[in-house]
Swiss-Prot record:
Subunit structure: Monomer.
Function of the protein: Involved in base excision repair of DNA damaged by oxidation or by mutagenic agents. Acts as a DNA glycosylase that recognizes and removes damaged bases. Has a preference for oxidized purines, such as 7,8-dihydro-8-oxoguanine (8-oxoG). Has AP (apurinic/apyrimidinic) lyase activity and introduces nicks in the DNA strand. Cleaves the DNA backbone by beta-delta elimination to generate a single-strand break at the site of the removed base with both 3'- and 5'-phosphates.
Name by which UniProt lists this protein: Formamidopyrimidine-DNA glycosylase
Organism of this sequence: Bacillus licheniformis (strain ATCC 14580 / DSM 13 / JCM 2505 / CCUG 7422 / NBRC 12200 / NCIMB 9375 / NCTC 10341 / NRRL NRS-1264 / Gibson 46)
Keywords: DNA damage, DNA repair, DNA-binding, Glycosidase, Hydrolase, Lyase, Metal-binding, Multifunctional enzyme, Zinc, Zinc-finger
GO MF term (any one): damaged DNA binding
Cofactor: Zn(2+)
Catalytic site: P2, E3, K60, R264
Manner of cofactor binding, per the entry note: Binds 1 zinc ion per subunit.
Family: Belongs to the FPG family.
Lineage, uppermost ranks: Bacteria, Bacillati, Bacillota, Bacilli, Bacillales
EC number(s) on file: 3.2.2.23, 4.2.99.18
Reactions catalysed: Hydrolysis of DNA containing ring-opened 7-methylguanine residues, releasing 2,6-diamino-4-hydroxy-5-(N-methyl)formamidopyrimidine; 2'-deoxyribonucleotide-(2'-deoxyribose 5'-phosphate)-2'-deoxyribonucleotide-DNA = a 3'-end 2'-deoxyribonucleotide-(2,3-dehydro-2,3-deoxyribose 5'-phosphate)-DNA + a 5'-end 5'-phospho-2'-deoxyribonucleoside-DNA + H(+)
Pfam families for the chain: Fapy_DNA_glyco, H2TH, zf-FPG_IleRS
């Protein structure tokens, strides 16, 4: 699933492609993707004639800001946006098509069909699900070391499980939780409320630094991720532990181990991240 760096990269590339374009019509081919309004026909009707003013991001969600509404889109496992001309062949996995007045069209492709789209009035998107319960952005002034420490003190779950909870901080998924924990020298199964202040301060720093570096590298392509211009990310070349089971640790040489934490495959170094 795309995490913050991948979604931010998609946002940046997509904004350059479609900002200022006006929607002529919307073709919904897989209706279950549309979550709000309930009727896909109403979704299409409300978007017709709307111009894309900007594209924002909240956690792993893309926010399309139009004249009179905001579309909140989650890519889930395999969702991708691409700009095409209307005479280009149509892929069978394209499930929503936004046709623009200039003859181009934005196609939403999703092999797994897990993606979602919600339509709101401006401002309403922040007070309703799915955005309402999200925690702070990791690059925001709200996400401080003190905030993280107080949040983790309230749970006896593993620190990995706590960080994957989007109510703690948004944008982190399997890849970047594993990487941040490795950089901070914290075992993924460590109990969240047992971390010391020193550990939490370092973890806070490494979360921000890891995400910053990943955004600068265009995200990580470990399976099928590409941005809206068809380009892969490059941060996978800098990963310390994720996807490196049995390979030598880049710091100590010990083989990277893989276990399951909170139902998620988890990579770590048993020497650098002692329990």
């Amino acid at each position: 699933m795309p995490e913050l760096p991948e979604v931010e990269t998609v946002r940046r590339t997509l904004a350059g492609l479609v900002r200022g374009k006006t929607i002529d019509a919307v073709d919904v081919r897989w209706t279950k993707i549309i979550k709000r309004p309930e009727e896909p026909e109403e979704f299409a009707r409300l978007l017709a004639g709307q111009t894309i003013q900007s594209i924002g991001r909240r956690g792993k969600f893309l926010l399309f800001h139009l004249d009179d509404c905001v579309m909140v889109s989650h890519l889930r496992m395999e969702g991708k946006y691409g700009l095409h001309q209307n005479d280009e062949p149509l892929d069978k996995h394209v499930h929503v098509i936004f046709r623009f007045t200039d003859g181009s069209e934005l196609r939403y492709r999703d092999v797994r069909k897990f993606g979602t789209m919600h339509l709101f009035k401006p401002g309403e998107e922040l007070t309703e699900l799915p955005l309402r319960q999200l925690g702070p952005e990791p690059f925001s002034s709200e996400f401080t070391a003190d905030y993280l420490r107080e949040r983790l003190k309230k749970t006896n779950r593993s620190v990995k499980t706590a960080l994957l909870d989007q109510r703690t901080v948004v944008g982190l998924g399997n890849i970047y939780v594993d990487e941040a924990l490795f950089r901070a020298g914290i075992h993924p199964e460590a109990t969240a409320n047992k971390l010391t202040k020193k550990q939490t301060v370092l973890l806070h720093k490494e979360i921000i630094q890891t995400l910053k570096e990943a955004v600068e590298a265009g995200g990580s392509t470990v399976r099928s991720y590409i941005n809206s211009q068809g380009e892969i990310g490059m941060f996978q070349l800098k990963l310390f532990v994720y996807g490196r089971k049995d390979e030598p640790c880049k710091k100590c040489g010990s083989p990277i181990e893989k276990t399951v934490v909170g139902g998620r495959g988890t990579h770590f170094c048993i020497k650098c991240q002692k329990k």
